[in-house]
Amino acid sequence: MARKKISLIGAGNIGGELAALIARRELGDVVLFDIPDKEGLAKGKALDLEQNGAVLGYDSKITGTSNWADVAGAEVVIITAGVPRKPGMSRDDLLGINLKIIRGVAENLKTHCPNAFVIVVSNPLDAMVYELKKVTGFAGKKVVGMAGVLDSGRFQLFLAREMNVAVKDVRAMVLGGHGDTMVPVTSYCTINGIPVKQLVAADKLGAIVERTRNGGGEIVKLMGTSAYYAPASAAVTATRWCRSSATAPSTASPSSSWSAATSWRRSSTGRAAAAARS
């Protein structure tokens, strides 16, 4: 039986880590795509990861390419293409150059992957999701941004470290845009079932909320470029959304998607999880 195809647009840090995670979990065969000037990078990473499979025991096929024909027919497409942030830059500073890139990707997806479920990672994320949906004409439920999973994970981690508890004991969710407008929902956050506001002082909670909003920028300052381990894991989590049925048990996961003129966070079951951005 043929495996499902998952195409990754962009073979940089996030794209490479995505390919590794997907292959190890054998979620499908992977096509790692990049522009012709970076085809060697895509092919080299693909070959390295296939050899890694022989060591670790996974059997996913990984193909590096710069040919859109190899992307065709993918069930899932994850887009990481674009220029990453540098120290001192906001996500919005990337708008001009990455908008041109996302438009080119969108035109090719219309031709080669008209039925794909598309997950956007490129920044500024909410604008990229909107532009890709607009250019492709795909249904809003078929084009999502992974930001909510990543932002919620950062919020969850910072709370766990503050309270010295296991990350899995914290329930936290971040809604809104992937940037300064994100809203860590403290009123619905719990630690072992106890509302976080009963456990964390208001000033400390406020500092954690602010650190969550600046979580990506903190890493950019330290590394000189954007994060990629956690964003890749968040995007892999998002691949489950296209596989879950409306009745299957599922964890609610926030994402960025567009319906008409409104940006909505949606759950992994496809139901609206919260209202528009603040």
Regions found by a protein language model. Give the residues of each.
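Rossmann-fold NAD(P)-binding glycine/threonine-rich loop
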Residues: P87-A139
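Conserved N-terminal Rossmann-fold NAD(P) cofactor-binding segment
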Residues: F33-A74
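Aromatic pocket-lining residues of Rossmann-like dinucleotide-binding sites
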Residues: I22
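Glycine-rich Rossmann-fold phosphate-binding loop(s) that bind the pyrophosphate
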Residues: A11-G12
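Rossmann-fold dinucleotide-binding core
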Residues: A81, F117-K197
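N-terminal Rossmann-fold NAD(P) dinucleotide-binding loop
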Residues: G15-G16
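NAD(P)-dependent Rossmann-like dehydrogenase/reductase catalytic/cofactor-binding core
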Residues: V167-S278
